[in-house]
Amino acid sequence: VKDIYFDDTPNDSTNNPRWRTILLGGLGAGGKGLYAIDITDVNNPTHLFAINNDNTNQSIQYWDIDGLKQEFGYASGSMDPKYDYRKLGETWSTPRIIRIKVSGKDKWVAVFGGGYNGAVNPNYGSAVFMMDLEDEGRLLKVIDIEDSANNIVNSIPADLSVITADGTEKATYNGALVYAADLEGKITKINLTDQGTLYQKTTLFNSESTSDNGRYIYKKPEATINNDNKLWLYFGTGNTQKLQEQSSQTQNRVYGIKDKDFPNFV
């Protein structure tokens, strides 16, 4: 939930930006989609948009602010890039609403992990999504997170760690630095600030996970500024989907890693 300033009547002929309170949510294990609701008046909430990735029927379904449904087939040639959510998995990752600079203009966006793929389907889940909240949820950017050379089918079910100036005075930038943890045990740092190259990414840490040692990351890295004035990320590994599983090969760990470049990207 976030207060954002935007034109919530995009289909009329006037530009009418105003402050609105937006609730943006995913379907969790129930599906591969998201929805947005204007809850400025909590007694009269209104639908803004909804998106669903129907990978069974190979189509993207989109409902606009008026409730009108559009459908885009994967292979039909009708896929508009602004609706290309084909890589979206089960939407476990909580969307974070932030303001970043795109092409010189400030823009309200949502950023979230690609979701869960059951650790079996490489076609979706292994990405970070950028959604344009000023354009009815249309896709702004997909940042792919590559698979490592191991036997894990990668995805990003975890919430992202999103560091902005609202959270720490050490963030001497506009926008956000984002840290994404994936099933392969990697931490990827993504630049969504006004400094350096927008959408640039780098692997900050690799726990060398395999299906044998079980070092999956399902949960968000928790961030803090330590007494060295550097940003540290703390997280643990483990398979939250098989809590009763026992194996002598399992080698889960708890990590604390320092981003020595913070508040810069590199």
PLM ranges: what are they?
Residues V1-V266:
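Beta-propeller fold recognition
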